């Protein structure tokens, strides 16, 4: 194949490539002009049949023609790819000025909302929020809180024990271990709120769940009395349930407080009624608990209280079934919006 015929074949290929409208057409034209049966590839294969003294020049002509065609093909391909990308971007372009339907906004879970609301109340009183591990040593969960070795709360019927046997590790049954850790780590006076998730071997039903949330409070200072405890609970209750809320205390027993009491609340509910409802437990910190963390009960006193977040949400918002809070159905969460 002569130099002139090679140039002619190259020019024909270049002209054909310029006429391609898209990448698919360009690929088909490449097969026509650079495929096995096209003139330039055939000329390249025939180089072996040319006399040696002519082969060098013939090979140079073939490579020059092939190089022109390959270079132009790459240029046209780049142009068509850019064109295609512009078309795709144009098709996917979003006109942000066009009116559209309102995007559905998600909502925090009501337990999260209530947890944050309660924490904000304590922070507003100048208290700190303290947290601790959910897998806890028995010492912090029971021993330091004045639970006797044979207390029924330690049994497998009430507590999840973590293996191996004898490890003395449990899933915490309350957030009270955070109080112990805080008293060991902090200098008195101490005013902390302890929110968190706790675990007990309860069956899931309308009023119980094996995994739930608590908020506990602890104050340790000089001269604290039950009057300070009552005032703190009154303020918390009115912030949560409304200004008409009342509280009352009923004598009870807890290992970690002495004296101890159950606290009830009365408030007008969202269904138009009102009545007394058991809310949580409270009392003055047992002197044995203070001694366990190195605080002299002759110099300092303290009060503590705790209540369940799920139970608080349930009777405050008139919810009949606690299972709705744990099953993850978005239809339950959305009505609460961004505030409970």
From Swiss-Prot:
Protein name stated in the entry: Phenylalanine--tRNA ligase alpha subunit
Gene Ontology molecular function, alphabetical: ATP binding; magnesium ion binding; phenylalanine-tRNA ligase activity; tRNA binding
Gene Ontology CC terms: cytoplasm
Organism: Corynebacterium efficiens (strain DSM 44549 / YS-314 / AJ 12310 / JCM 11189 / NBRC 100395)
Cofactor entry: Mg(2+)
UniProt cross-references to CDD domains, sorted A to Z: PheRS_alpha_core
InterPro entries documented for this protein: aa-tRNA-synth_II, aa-tRNA-synth_II/BPL/LPL, Phe-tRNA-synth_IIc_asu, Phe-tRNA_ligase_II_N, Phe_tRNA_ligase_alpha1_bac, Phenylalanyl-tRNA_Synthase, tRNA-bd_arm
Gene Ontology biological-process entries: phenylalanyl-tRNA aminoacylation
Family of this protein: Belongs to the class-II aminoacyl-tRNA synthetase family. Phe-tRNA synthetase alpha subunit type 1 subfamily.
